[in-house]
Amino acid sequence: MEVVIITGMSGAGRSTAAHVLEDSNWYVVDNLPPAMLLPLIKEVEGEHQKVAVVIDVRSRAFFEELAQSRAALKQMQVNVRILFLDSADEILVRRYEATRRPHPLQAGDRIFDGVTRERKLLGDLRATADIVLDTSALNVHQLGNKIGEVFAQLSDRGIHLSLLSFGYKYGIPYDADFILDC
């Protein structure tokens, strides 16, 4: 079994990474507390070979729980990797300004203050991560491609093409992107 723990700075692309892995047939769980990681893996062990978990580690207790869970999984012969997504502070601030959402650690201060607090809290986790990916210069599509490169065994999704014959009197297919009348 392969387990990827997706974590990192808020706004660096954790959700995007989770979506990419989910589209590549990984079993993905978002916002899982670190204490629930081990029970989850035991629950899905026979059903899924590839599991990705998005964990938000913003407290010391969560970091210690994650370290314990990771050690327990390695004892169970589970291949566990931590993917830490990072980005430059000014980029994170710009992303939060664009979405007009407050940073989770902002606490009434400036967005930059929240980013600084989070970077301080996640410093130890970044140091222990197996893969650190800087998303500063990446857009959503480039991040998806980069995740695909990092996890080379991802299926090549390529282009999906369906040809369908239909009659106009029955209506146009709802999921059609292009319709040719020949």
Regions found by a protein language model. Give the residues of each.
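Switch/connector loops and helix/strand junctions flanking conserved nucleotide-binding motifs
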Residues: 61-63, 89-96, 104, 122, ...
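Hydrophobic anchor at the beta1->P-loop junction of P-loop NTPases
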Residues: 6
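C-terminal accessory "lid"/substrate-recognition subdomains
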Residues: 113-182
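Conserved glycine(s) of the Walker
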Residues: 13
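Conserved phosphate-donor/acceptor-positioning beta-strand/loop module used by diverse small-molecule
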Residues: 76-100, 133-134, 176-182
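Post-Walker A alpha-helix
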Residues: 17-18
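The conserved Walker
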Residues: 10
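Conserved nucleotide-sensing/catalytic segment adjacent to the nucleotide-binding pocket
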Residues: 24-73
